[in-house]
Amino acid sequence: MPRPELPLPEGWEEARDFDGKVYYIDHRNRTTSWIDPRDRYTKPLTFADCISDELPLGWEEAYDPQVGDYFIDHNTKTTQIEDPRVQWRREQEHMLKDYLVVAQEALSAQKEIYQVKQQRLELAQQEYQQLHAVWEHKLGSQVSLVSGSSSSSKYDPEILKAEIATAKSRVNKLKREMVHLQHELQFKERGFQTLKKIDERMSDAQGGYKLDEAQAVLRETKAIKKAITCGEKEKQDLIKSLAMLKDGFRTDRGSHSDLWSSSSSLESSSFPMPKQFLDVSSQTDISGSFSTSSNNQLAEKVRLRLRYEEAKRRIANLKIQLAKLDSEAWPGVLDSERDRLILINEKEELLKEMRFISPRKWTQGEVEQLEMARRRLEKDLQAARDTQSKALTERLKLNSKRNQLVRELEEATRQVATLHSQLKSLSSSMQSLSSGSSPGSLTSSRGSLAASSLDSSTSASFTDLYYDPFEQLDSELQSKVELLFLEGATGFRPSGCITTIHEDEVAKTQKAEGGSRLQALRSLSGTPRSMTSLSPRSSLSSPSPPCSPLITDPLLTGDAFLAPLEFEDTELSTTLCELNLGGSGTQERYRLEEPGPEGKPLGQAASVAPGCGLKVACVSAAVSDESVAGDSGVYEASAQRPGTSEAAAFDSDESEAVGATRVQIALKYDEKNKQFAILIIQLSHLSALSLQQDQKVNIRVAILPCSESSTCLFRTRPLDSANTLVFNEAFWVSISYPALHQKTLRVDVCTTDRSHTEECLGGAQISLAEVCRSGERSTRWYNLLSYKYLKKQCREPQPTEAPGPDHVDAVSALLEQTAVELEKRQEGRSSSQTLEGSWTYEEEASENEAVAEEEEEGEEDVFTEKVSPEAEECPALKVDRETNTDSVAPSPTVVRPKDRRVGAPSTGPFLRGNTIIRSKTFSPGPQSQYVCRLNRSDSDSSTLSKKPPFVRNSLERRSVRMKRPSSVKSLRTERLIRTSLDLELDLQATRTWHSQLTQEISVLKELKEHLEQAKNHGEKELPQWLREDERFRLLLRMLEKKVDRGEHKSELQADKMMRAAAKDVHRLRGQSCKEPPEVQSFREKMAFFTRPRMNIPALSADDV
């Protein structure tokens, strides 16, 4: 029988409190009770008897405006905020204990990283002192510097100078890294201790927080948030004042420090300084700011709108992909595994420095002790590689894919911001982009990227606190980690599909039945389920990159070892960068025909030094012909010309030793971070260098002339000698693009014996004046010339008379003989590749020439400054009809979209309406389909194919928009289930946030004092340690945006859009997550305490 139909027992009375709450009076015992006496007949007595969401006798659910839902146990007269029906609190305790184990491992790994860095710093300081002493002793005698072997790097003045600068830079960099790592260690140590105390406190408290205790915790949290808001305002004021101070200093990146060199180093380079000019012969390559004529105004608007809508769709797709990846990730768990890989990398760097350290002035005991430490370190590294799990590699691949998606999202947001400003400035009469009714608007209700959806930069919210928007490693560390785990994955690289992340080592997740979150929390699993693929078309083991941009995954393809940081097409990148080669024409270049690794002739551009001496080793090498064809997927061997005899220049033994060894190198310049990347991929046909048995081979790379304060010399790890060696090592140099054009890349193949004596067998010198600024990666093969052969040629007697046509050496004779034929063949091949492989202008012009001409203008401006003669023979593709004097084909008349015939009834994304079918009775004209915009919804001039219902008395009569029915909202918005553990974590997190903010404010105040002192002393440039630190360079970049807001308006808008996109990804992740949102939120809260967010770096130590 229902309870309302049951009468109250005798002696009981129902009454109401002053706030309307019902209570019951027992007149017999003269007591009051909140429990209805009839409940003992209708309610279950224990939780075991409860069905569905019932509460047992004596329990009541109540609501507090501040705390939310809480529960009252009238039997014990206590309150609690945990739901007694859900064992979520117990699951939280288990998750916290498991995370403490992971955090302890990460902390111990980072402590070991700090110790290894300390050893590296000690070795670097010893090496710098020894090299500096050698330089001082040998500085006065140039003869003693070159009296030894010219192949020994320790006695080469240029290499020795680069060694000293590199050692100094390494010491300063290691000092800065140790200061930063020390602060990270302190943060993680405090966070670990905080989590440990929370675990102990919550384990002792059986009932958790009561209602009054929870209210007190929330009041304290709110007070700390107010203090954080005030601190953020103070921080912003300090940043503004620093921006004003920084504006008074000169921050030219192309200063003399980047171009620091001696006269000998400039003379030694066989590449001349490039001419700084713009080719304005036709006046069609000058990129303007969309200043089109009046007749192209409409076409320009349409083109920009199309690109704008396409970029918007790309951003939406990238956000969905990022949300899917984040929903499968464990926040904080990957950090410990990444730290272990970083530890392996640091040990490898230490091992490399132990191998290449100079043994001068070392006692025999010190050398033996160093050798023992090196062997012990080799064993540790081998054991660490053997224990690397497959699931770890898979998780790191997904993390690298996420970083790639974040980079694509940054590019897309910058493109949208630029297009938005261009559309606004193009015409004031076009439809406003900020209208909320437009489906493609920046401020639309769904997927908004506008600044209006952003919270204030000084407000404190838990979304900003726990979710770090797109935190990434720095570029150098990211490349090392990716190459490290990619190298470890080669041992078990499967031929078929790769298994999921946790398939082999983690229990699978049970599906949550029903839609209730309470039931989902009752069947919690400790690990999220991983998806096999994010797209039905994606293949994790595909040998070639996918065609769709939505599933681009270069790190999971066969080209991952060659392009760890790039996602564009390799063929397109190589072809585009090749178009920019060889434009100077100021140096006499010849073609050299040499047998390749497979016995096929190679084409090489080389310049022969006129003299013989120490500088003869600086031989410039260019890309071979076959390597370009191989990169494009088509291999065409160079035809051997009749009548050309190699015996005329070389004998049979020496012909294979000269120029036959090749090295594959990828070059890329990152314009955003001002960094130049060098990727040493592999070395082929090493036997041509006459290598001895049981020798280890490494490649030494030097950027000459060396900068005064940057690392400019690198060495790969030594490998056992073989005919083909695969290195896959990347090196990063911080340098400006104008300074890079003045540099030369010297590549040497060296061997090292047990006494740490380095001997160079062969090398090449590559000009960096042709590096693409657009960020395209160019991969090429370079031929290496043997130093032994060159020394032998130098020892031959030279003729005394002046050189003439009859008095040239054998190499020059061969070069002059083959130059004309090679040039002709190269011209034909380059023109065919240019027309067929990279540019597809004819197809685009056939569709819409007026739109395509303007669209290609923004994509070609990178390659218009220096164009090869082969590329100039191609037909003109961009034409300014008002200034160009060449005869060009007449362009079709620009027409409006409604008058242009279309081949298919598809509507562009810039149109809001559907396709309009022209009425047959309207006019006797052609009865074909056309596209138009309607100004009225009830227009009788044409008929909608799917006419929407007419709304009478509508305010907007231009078009009828059906508003979505507003969903019926509950009186209280649905809250996440919160426990005492959640409240405690929130309280400690706000305390940590406030403490970190206080430290950042103190660092900014100290930095302000340094700049004020430097300004008072009359200094014109910023301090050197401030310009060299990567983190402070980012801070200076942010200060530049604060000062020149008009100049960096698009960048600021892009930053706002990225923050909005991060919040959208966070929101979408909660929708796509297969687990309850409470689980993901709790993991973020735990990870916050062990993942430092240092936006303002600590001041570094004093440099050398």
Swiss-Prot record:
Sequence motif ADDV motif, location on chain: 1102-1104
Residues recorded as bearing Phosphoserine in the entry: 141, 535, 542, 887, 891, 919, 923, 939, 967, 970
Residue ranges constituting the C2 domain according to the UniProt record: 659-782
Stored CDD domains: C2_Kibra, WW
InterPro entries: C2_dom (IPR000008), C2_domain_sf (IPR035892), C2_WWC (IPR037771), WW_dom (IPR001202), WW_dom_sf (IPR036020), WWC/KIBRA_Hippo_Reg (IPR051105)
Localization: Cytoplasm, Perinuclear region; Nucleus; Cell projection, Ruffle membrane; Cytoplasm, Cytosol
Keyword Protein biosynthesis: no
Name of the featured protein: Protein KIBRA
Organism, as annotated: Mus musculus
Upper lineage: Eukaryota, Metazoa, Chordata, Craniata, Vertebrata
